[in-house]
Regions:
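Cellulosome-associated attachment modules in secreted, modular CAZymes
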Residues: 19-25, 696, 796-894
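Short beta-strand elements of extracellular/lumenal beta-sandwich folds
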Residues: 510-531, 537-539
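A surface/secretory-pathway sequence property marking extracellular, secreted
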Residues: 542-591
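Low-complexity, intrinsically disordered segments enriched in Ser/Thr together with acidic residues
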Residues: 585-619
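Terminal connector regions
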Residues: 606-667
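Serine/threonine-rich, repeat-prone extracellular segments and beta-strand-based repeat modules
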Residues: 736-782, 793
Length: 894
């Protein structure tokens, strides 16, 4: 998402470029080594990737599917690498695409792209029609507080959204706004002009909406109440939009009144140069400033020389300078306006230059050549005419960006993205898909470029970034030719296993085998879930039969099901004969869509089950001949490996693994390769750290912490609850080296919109022990990815008179035998000796550090989480980092 949300002084930027000049040497586009037809074809592909709603039949992106079909207005383009929809950028982008097709449709057709181009343009325009509600507009769809803290694919977005928010429809926002409505009108006018002959009814609909939208925008003449989009797009002007749209209405209707409005009402209110009364000619056309596009259209529509001269100032500023002002040029010759979307600005100006050459400077050879060379240089810079021979268009050329900032194309299944596109580092991996045709933000003013997904100043992609670039390509294919690639897009083969099984042996004894299994969903071709999901575990009872027993002596039972309390609850079948003495049990999800590629806890489903015979049958149970047991190791999660001997099914269709008779999945259904995880031996490992590679993952996460319990913990019957002294903190850990303190030892009562104090259990009318809970709000849970969003403490109500307040109790934690002596079996982090490591251990350790609790024996040994042989605050920090998945093992000195 672009971070530019306020107007920047164009004059200041202009002055910084005074020492530069447009390069004297240029590459003639007619002799270019670049195929502009292919570039246009791939830009259409990018816009198809951005489609929301039901996927059209003509969409060629094989790894995209239906998504967000419950949006209040379906369809439209996702704005950038996220999944928000802004009417402003949809309209701005569609208008430029429509303008490019209108002026250079013959070239688009010769390049073999007219049908696809029209399909993409109509897709966006139909969305704008849907956003026109008559008395207002839908200006934004999506929840930014969720969207920008989750990284995953559009197809499973709503699965995660429903899980986190409990809603099946995204929020939408309405307003009346002169800027947005004028841009909508402009876009719809281009639709009318492009389709009036081929699709007259559709064109009529576009024009009717354009006229009405413009009339309402003109009557309002104000920026609307668009608060929801302001963190992303802060509109600063609207007269430029009215000016721009009025010119399009004139072109669509031929009615003079629109040009009259320009002259009398809009032009006097257009932008001026800094500290000057001169009409603005610096800066560039973009989503918040369409003035120069309006000036160009007005010059064309009126034929008045003063407006031709006015637009010439703009192109002079972008080339050799005008009035002492000139844009900055990079050492390689890129006109560089601004750090956000530098190529977006340059290519949009290139398009305006092409239009001006063809419609303003037909009789001025010098200017036509100058501005054509300028535009050619800009576009060819994008394709590799720079000192690095680097293409800034994904999928064009031999060397292009690898770490573009885009969620769906990444194919991330676990909400981890910081090293996507890298070859080294934790969780480094390529994008699942190549985002063909996307123009990235671009280099800085020294031609430097950081190809990292987190450096989105450089690597951002967006519909408005591609808009002027695409329109300029229309001009280039008409001027210089170009052909479509008949083999594009290429057929994609999954780069990793999409659905697969992992397993290890929990326990194995003389009468049973207990397995831990994970059903995995890493799908990205496209990302999806399977409702009717099941898997089979095969075992051989030959040793039982030889001893005179039968399958009737075998029992099966689930011991743990991650989804036991939700819609995915797993059931296990009685043993089913496969062949001879080989049987299997089928574990079936009530609803397999709970296994989804949306996060660390959802991309896998854990189940532990036991296959056993009666304990009194001795010496005949042997799992080593079991088909599915082969290759498994004992050790719980540490020993988990991917195994193709546990088969997975979508209904009756085999999608993973090899059955005992050699049956494999149909390659047409799924393409997979077996992967395994290298075993990592640690004293304590966290329960959610799994990968199918040999890498350790460090996750950003937060936690709510209880710093101080209230001063009063014991009450007499009838006394009111008093929470004086209650203090909590909220900390956010990212990477493995840093922590942000969001709230530090605050009273939750002071932040009622952020924390809820749940006292519903407390009953002062009768004696008892009651739990008081403090819970974080849903926005805190989302924004800081809280692994622990609740803390609690207990208070006691006594039925007799108490003469003194209860003092803090100092306690000693001992072993189960009551003796505070080490047993030698250390489970680091398990301070309360319950055999598990969880948040209750962290609470107890914090109390120990504060001096309220004394840990001895095993508890003290387990508390030494940093391995320093001392119990201090660092142990508490290390344990918390383990619990929120920043580190994956204890003890740790990190």
């Amino acid at each position: 998402m672009k971070k530019w949300i306020a107007a920047i002084s164009a004059a200041v930027l202009a002055v910084t470029g005074m020492a530069s000049a447009i390069p004297a040497a240029t590459v003639t586009a007619a002799d270019s080594k670049y195929n502009y037809g292919e570039a246009l074809q791939k830009s259409m592909f990018f816009y198809e990737v951005q489609q929301s709603g039901k996927k059209p039949d003509w969409n060629e992106v094989s790894w995209r599917s239906d998504c967000m079909t419950n949006d209040y207005v379906t369809g439209g383009w996702f704005d950038a690498g996220d999944h928000l929809k802004f009417t402003l950028t949809n309209a701005y982008s569609a208008a430029l695409l429509g303008w490019g097709l209108l002026n250079y449709g013959d070239g688009v057709e010769k390049a073999g792209q007219r049908t696809m181009y029209e399909n993409n343009l109509q897709f966006a325009l139909d969305y704008l029609v849907g956003c026109d509600q008559g008395d207002n507009i839908v200006y934004m769809i999506g929840d930014g507080s969720f969207d920008h803290v989750w990284w995953g694919s559009a197809e499973v977005y709503m699965d995660k959204y429903e899980l986190m928010k409990g809603e099946t429809e995204r929020p939408y926002y309405t307003c009346e706004d002169s800027c947005i409505q004028a841009d909508m009108a402009a876009a719809l006018c281009t639709g009318y002009l492009n389709f009036k002959d081929s699709k007259p009814e559709k064109a009529k609909e576009y024009l009717e909406h354009a006229i009405d939208l413009f009339d309402r925008a003109d009557k309002l003449r104000a920026i609307g109440d668009d608060a929801a989009e302001q963190p992303y797009y802060k509109i600063t002007t609207f007269y430029d939009d009215l000016f721009y749209a009025a010119n399009w209405l004139y072109m669509a209707t031929g009615e003079q009144k629109y040009l009259d409005l320009c002259k009398t009402d809009y032009i006097p209110n257009l932008g001026k140069e800094e500290q000057s009364s001169e009409m603005k000619y610096t800066w560039g056309m973009c989503w918040d400033d369409v003035m120069q596009g309006g000036v160009l259209l007005y010059a064309i529509n009126t034929g008045e020389s003063q407006w031709k001269d006015q637009f010439t100032k703009h192109l002079e500023y972008w080339t050799t300078g005008y009035g002492g002002k000139q844009i900055t040029y990079t050492p390689d010759g890129l006109p560089w306006l601004f750090q956000w979307g530098s190529l977006r600005h340059a290519t949009t100006t290139a398009f305006l230059a092409y239009v001006a050459v063809d419609q303003l400077y037909q009789d001025d050879t010098a200017k036509a050549e100058k501005y054509t060379k300028f535009a050619d240089n800009v576009m060819n810079y994008c394709f590799g005419d720079n000192s690095k021979n680097f293409s800034y268009v994904v999928g064009m050329g031999d060397d292009y960006p690898q770490a573009w900032h885009h969620r769906t194309s990444s194919g991330a299944w676990n909400d981890k993205w910081s090293n996507i596109g890298q070859t080294e580092g934790e969780d480094a991996k390529p994008h699942a898909h190549i985002l063909y045709g996307a123009l990235v933000g671009g280099p800085d003013q020294k031609d430097s470029y950081s190809d990292k997904i987190g450096d989105y100043q450089y690597t951002e992609v967006a519909i408005d970034y591609n808009a002027g670039y695409t329109a300029a390509l229309c001009a280039m294919v008409e001027k210089y030719g170009g052909t479509s690639d008949p083999d594009f897009p290429p057929t994609e083969t999954p780069k990793w296993d999409e659905f697969f099984m992992k397993a290890s042996v929990n326990q194995s004894a003389s009468s049973y085998t207990e397995l831990k299994v994970f059903a995995m969903n890493h799908s990205a071709w496209p990302a999806r879930t399977i409702k009717n999901l099941s898997y089979n575990y095969y075992f051989d009872i030959s040793e039982l039969v030889d001893a005179g027993y039968s399958i009737n002596d075998v029992s099966v039972k689930i011991g743990y099901d991650q989804h036991s309390s939700d819609k995915g609850k797993i059931s296990i079948s009685d043993p089913i004969q496969y062949s001879g003495n080989i049987y299997y049990v089928k574990l079936s999800f009530a609803d397999g869509s709970v296994v989804m590629p949306t996060g660390q806890s959802e991309h896998r489903s854990e189940c532990q089950f036991r296959i056993s015979i009666p304990d009194n049958i001795q010496g005949v149970w042997d799992p080593t001949n079991d088909y599915s047991y082969a290759g498994l190791e004992q050790g719980g999660e540490d020993a988990m490996v991917a195994t193709d001997h546990i088969t997975m099914y979508d209904g009756d269709t085999l999608i993973w693994g090899v059955e005992p008779d050699g049956t494999k999945p149909d390659p047409a259904v799924t393409t997979t390769t077996t992967t395994t995880t290298e075993q990592t031996t640690t004293t304590t490992t966290r329960a959610t750290m799994t990968t199918t590679s040999n890498e350790i993952i460090y996750e950003s996460a937060g936690a709510l912490l209880l710093d101080d319990e209230p001063e009063k913990l014991t009450y007499r019957v009838g006394e009111d609850l008093d929470l004086t002294g209650l203090r909590i903190s909220l900390k956010y850990y990212h990477g493995k080296d840093s922590c942000d303190v969001i709230y530090d030892k605050v009273s939750p009562a002071d932040y009622p919109d952020k924390f809820t104090i749940d006292t519903s259990e407390f009953d002062s009318s009768k004696s008892g022990t009651y739990t008081i809970r403090v819970k974080a709000s849903s926005d805190l849970i989302l924004n800081y990815r809280l692994s622990f969003a609740e803390v609690s403490f207990k208070v006691t109500v006594e039925d007799h008179e108490s003469t003194t307040e209860t003092s803090p109790v100092t306690t000693t934690t001992t072993t189960a035998s009551g003796q505070p002596t080490p047993s030698g079996a250390v489970l680091y982090g398990d301070t309360n000796l319950d055999g598990r490591v969880d948040i209750t251990d962290a609470v107890l350790l914090n109390k120990s550090v504060a001096g309220a609790v004394v840990l001895e024996g095993d508890a003290k040994q387990n508390a030494d989480c940093d391995g320093s042989n001392e119990i201090d605050s660092n142990d508490a920090v290390v344990l918390l980092r383990f619990l929120v998945h920043i580190i994956n093992s204890l003890p740790s000195a990190e």
